[in-house]
Amino acid sequence: MSAPGQHSPVVAGTVRRYRVTHTTRYTYDDVVSSSYGRCYLTPRALSDQRVESSQVSVDPEPDDRSTGVDVYGNSDTYFHVRTPHDALTVTAESVVEVDPIDQGLLLSAAALGPWEECRPAGTSAPVVEFAMDLYPAEITDAVREYAAEVFTPGRPLLEAIVDLTNRINTDFTYRSGSTAISTRVATVMARREGVCQDFARVALACLRAVGLAGRYVSGYLATEPPPGRERVVGADASHAWAAVWLPGERWLAFDPTNDKLVDERHVTVAWGRDYDDVPPLRGVIYTESSSSRIEVSVDVAPIDPAASGNPANRASDAH
């Protein structure tokens, strides 16, 4: 592994095309009379990501459903199932095309200039919102100390972000099941372990601790099996990373879990201030059931040969 801040230059990739299938199945030990759900499972249409098709299906068929766009521009789907059921399945299928990382962004004056110049002071309110701490507060003394080691005076923003990405990847252990959705950043900092959404939230707390604007991004990561092994359908998972704002309304996305800048292997679904703004699926049920089980299957399948051949990466088990 390279020393912090000394990574090799990013090599331009090629356009990738994927078929993404995300299936969530709930089973209950008693009949559910009514289920309400809201999900963020539709990839965003972006300048570097084109959504060729996307649909969300629910079984049993909902009695009521609608789609909309939230305050951050994310597509969401709402549904209400009133048919009595003991299992509920939500499946999202999309075909997306993703461009390589923008070399112009990496070579921009903002990316190569002092990080202090990327603070959003005096800019529009929506951007400033991403620089504010959450409630309850996530910026602790430990976060400030960790961020101060990275964001030294006058350091180029890109260099600092690459260093932060590498430090989190090095200092924290990826351990599936070690945290829950409700786990606080302070706990992750103390334990030095977690999964992708934890590492993204640590990165965001560090950005905000020094006055930078950062957003939480949910999506998928195309993964490759070990050499000699066949690709297992459904073995992928939801993923999460962070992005920092640059003047000119541009964002530089980075993936601490895999120690890399976000590129054509990442499929962006939604973004917000934190995980709570964009959970893949959230809902309420009415039942006498005392227990339930959730099974999640995610498959990010390359549609053409050019989309395979990427090194093994880690995605999260956050559902």
Model regions and ranges:
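Short beta-strand segments enriched in hydrophobic/aromatic residues
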Residues: Y28, V96, L246, V300-P302
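A short, structural micro-pattern
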Residues: Y18, S33, R50, P84-L88, ...
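Secondary-structure boundary elements
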Residues: A111-E117, A121-G194, V202, V210, ...
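Hydrophobic/aromatic-rich core segments of domains that either
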Residues: S2-G5, N166, D198-Y286, R293
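Alpha-helix N-cap/helix-initiation motif
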Residues: G13, M189-E193, R231
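Short hairpin/turn module used for nucleic-acid contact or packing/dimerization
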Residues: G13, D277-H319
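Intrinsically disordered, low-complexity N-terminal segments that are enriched in acidic
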Residues: M1-E117
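A structural signal for short, well-ordered beta-strand segments
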Residues: H22-T24, A92-S94, L164, A242, ...
